[in-house]
Amino acid sequence: NINSLKEDCLINDNFIKLYKKFSPGPITYILNLKKNSKISEYVTNKKKNLAVRFSKHKIFRELLKKLDYPLAAPSANITTKLSSVDVSGVREEFGSKIKYILDGGKCIIGLESTIIDLVNKPAILRLGGLDILKIKKTLGFKIDININPKKNVAPGQSRLHYSPGIPLKMNVKKSKNDVAFILIKKRKIRLNNHYHLSANGNLDEAAKNLYSCLRKIK
């Protein structure tokens, strides 16, 4: 919660507005660390700021309540590989490298959290599960989108991050036989290898099913 956060990070008015509106939820805040912070340099990579998120998942929140310290919890994927949205994906990706898995079922949203830098002027560093229009409305001003693969200051800025390991193209209408097609909405088409992310084109449902679909294809 925000009280434990204050022990390690400096908070500001913009953070308070977003925290009250969207946390717990799919938003990650970049905040300045306090000089007396006890967060390990292995977590911060010796940087003076920290990425913080408040999970909404009931089981994970119960786990956090039993701890008297924050938990470093990166996404369940190897760098440049697909994110896992359920236990089967984690096992496929990591195999015997992980001894224990806390199974909370399939991810509710299915996409990474939206990352917003609040150290200076608010800026989006990674698009994700929270609509930036909602963030803009809450703050009351325009937000910069600073997604620069060359700087790579946040997860997801690399062009290969979360990639399926096979070529991926957008808006393809015709192709060879060894190609799979992913459709947002279910429709009657004459294609053998096609998958749909939502029965009626619901974007929230499509987002939830995207990574699972890519994992099936690869």
Q: What is each of the regions a protein language model found here?
A:
Residues 1-218:
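Active-site-adjacent structural elements in enzyme catalytic cores
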